[in-house]
Amino acid sequence: MWNLLKSELLKLRRCQILLVGLVALALCPLVQYGSQLIVEAEYRNPNYDFSALFENVVWGNTQIFLPISLVMIGGWLIDRESTHDTLKNIMTIPVSMPKMLGAKLLLVGMLAVLLGLYSVGITLITGLTVGLSGLTAEVFFHGGTQIVLAALTTYLVCMPLILIFGQIRGAYLGGSILAFFLGYSMLFFKSGILASIYPFSAALILVGFDMSEYAGTTTSSTPLLAVIGVGIMVLW
């Protein structure tokens, strides 16, 4: 497995599509802070600080930026074997298809955690640059932990999309577009029960994120249902 992971990592290092994830997650805190500057004064948060920025980034990453990035990168890793006609060479080693797909998924999972850490760093730099207040060790640890854990749970939710669209030649771009719509659809689940079951919102609930302010949920979420919602995607 280690040799497979190492070979997949070498492929990823030669892949410019990784820049999609880096740019997307760098844009997230900028977009979230920028939205505070362009909205009308009555809708603006007068107490916008580091805590609010971290929450915004957790929401933005899970709703838009991570689903697009992870499905695109993971789908490309699987798709390239058929596109570049290298699958027949791999099969002669021999390496079973499930083992190869498992190595690719494991790499994307590790990448999700690294992208989460990267997002924490970019969020910190953004907040310091624009002069936000309220940065304490507790705020940084809580916000940073939520960002990284949400990146991992979002990856778990995106696994079926990566597998399905990665094995359909040239379809990983379509899969990333579908991931965007599925992530954005969190806004439409106002019931706490429905939000807990819907995989993308369940990914946030599992890390202790308050959905009421962002999705307008009318009842409290249920962590046990969130485990089921994410578990269904993992066991797909």
State each model region's role:
Residues L77-G109:
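Helix-loop-helix units of permease transmembrane domains in multi-pass membrane transporters
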Residues I68-S82, L87, C158-L173, V230-W236:
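Transmembrane alpha-helical segments in integral membrane proteins
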Residues V20-A26, R169-L187:
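Pore- or pathway-lining transmembrane helices of multi-pass membrane proteins that form conduits
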Residues I78, L87, I122, T126, ...:
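Hydrophobic alpha-helical interface/terminus motif in multipass membrane transporters
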Residues M1-L25, G170:
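Aromatic- and glycine-rich beta-strand/loop motifs that create alpha-glucan
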Residues G34-F54, S176-W236:
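Terminal transmembrane helical anchor/hairpin motif
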Residues A26-S69, G102-Q167, Y172, T219-L225:
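Secretory targeting signals
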Residues L5-L12, M100-L101, G144, V148:
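Hydrophobic alpha-helical elements at and bordering transmembrane segments
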